[in-house]
Amino acid sequence: MGMEVVGTEAAPAEVKVTDGEVNLFQENESKATAKEREEAVLFGSDNSTATANGAANGADLAPPKDAEEDWPEARKTHSFFFVKIRLLEDPKLKMKIDQAEKDFQKKIQARSQIFEAIKAKKNERFGIISELKPLAAENKQYNEAVSEKLKAIEPLRNRLGKFRDENNAIRAQGAGICSSIEELEKSIKRLNDRISHESIPLDEEKRLIKQIRELEKTRPKVISTSANRAQIQDTVVERDAIQDQVKIIGEGIDGVKKERQAVRSKIKVLEDELKAIDMEMGSLQEDLTAANARKDKAHESLVQLRHARDAYNASFHQNRQLLSKARDLASRSELAQVQELYKTQVDKFVAEWCNSKAFREDYEKRILSSLNSRQLSRDGRMRNPDEKPIFIETEAAAPPVEQEPIQSKMPAKQAKEAPAPQAEVSPKDESRVKAIAKPSKAKSSLDADDDYEAESPKEKPKPKEVDVAKLKEIKRQEEMEKNRLALERKKKLAEKQAAKAAARAQKEAEKKLKREEMRARRRAGAADTEASTESDNRSDGAAEAQAEDDSAPASAPVMREQRESVRYSRNVVTKSKAPLPKAILRRKKAQSYWSWAGPAAAVAAALVALLAVLGYYQYYLPASASN
């Protein structure tokens, strides 16, 4: 099995050369180089300065002081090889994380859509409130104006009430007595005349005398009542003026109330709209709360899955931190610490490699991709030309199951136009299909509500969540379509009823016209002789025969029309439009006018004579007896 290592170079220490030290450059120098150096030193020198034995001075043969800069020593590099642990992603866990991220993004988008809807409703609500404020101020002004006018009219009404109470008191006081002295005198005089000029019994005369005495007793009351009435009559002008003022103020109040009512109607409409918007905002707020809860739950699932991924790659993260620390120590030339860190890491890796089979399998999985990319075999050898690449076992992610779109309710018109299915389903099969569909719908709804959690390998993918706002819009469009179709049906029914009513009215008018014609014929025929009646009967018979001849060809299209109506409208009961048979009335023999006019005149004359006799005995005889 191959092992992947990472080399770390420690910065070498600088080599400093002093005068007392042995120059390594001079020790390693070859003789040829020394000879050349000696010749170079002796070249151009004065022979007089040489020693007697011809040897040069050792100090003159030493290298110059800047030799270290011209010929620097090769820098020594320390290399330490650490074991590298690569990142490995679990395909199942990666698929779950991707699905959880998609679900989380969908929840965020759904919440943002609800936010936008709430924002739009808030703007609409703000517009309605801005319209309500001036209307409320105007309504307040109208209320103040009405209250001021009511305050102004209150004392006038009190004054009129006082007049009314006084008038009622005077009327109650003068009830049963004469209204004035003149009327009292006339009543007394009439009774006296009756006593003196008429022949009446004694009891009647006593009764009349008693009435005269009672009238005389009421004279003081009549005088006081007439005086009070005179006083009230003096206040009539003032009362009329007050009534005029009350009328003018009342008209002003009525005008202000009409304007206020118009403003209040506008305010009521806006308040109803505001209440509807508040209700919609409340429902949207509930949807937002639910969306926030779903988003938080999806985020928790995603965080848990990410923690699981981090726990699965904990060895990779630890190795990454160790390598970063080693690079940091190497950059600071801390050789001992790098060496100690290297030894500790390698010893630990070897111990785990020898003791744990799971560690070996995990490390092998992690390094396979690196070996494959470097064209190496499993044991780290160079791959032979005929050797196949290393097969990395990875489970392919299952393709996402496409969720079937929600079938919205079709309008009635489209449902009628849609063709019927070819295969007919029996009632038993239909009930079985419905029974299977109910648990599947419940399961899909539970899966849609639950957020992404740790799934078993056999768990089915969850269907996509449907947007709430989109569903509401679809339902609203369906309701509008239903209302439109209902209105069309009502219009058609109203048109049919109107047509039937018009036909019925036309038939009634024709019947009435026929009745009038028959009555006119009866009246005209009553004065004719028997000869004329016979001629009329003949003419009626001829007219009837002609009508029957005319109705015979017309009956054919009528029957055809009835057949067509029966053929195309099965459920509609058609009425026959064939003309009804004409009724022939036999005329009675006319009676003579003088046969009943003479007796009637005699009876009337007898009644007039009887009434004249009764009037004479009732009126004229008593008057003559009294005179």
Swiss-Prot record:
Keyword presence, tRNA processing: no
Annotated compartments: Cell membrane
Induction, as annotated: Induced by brassinolide.
Bias-annotated ranges (Basic and acidic residues): 28-40, 455-498, 505-519
Keyword Cell membrane: yes
Disulfide bonds: none
Transmembrane segments: 596-616
Coiled-coil parts of chain: 253-300, 468-519
Gene Ontology cellular component list: plasma membrane
Chain positions covered by the region annotation Disordered: 28-70, 394-572
Key words of the record: Cell membrane, Coiled coil, Membrane, Transmembrane, Transmembrane helix
Bias (Low complexity): 45-60, 411-424, 434-445
Membrane topology classification: Single-pass membrane protein
SUBUNIT field: Interacts with BRI1.
Role played: May regulate plasma membrane ATPase activity.
Family under the similarity heading: Belongs to the plant proton pump-interactor protein family.
Protein name: Proton pump-interactor BIP103
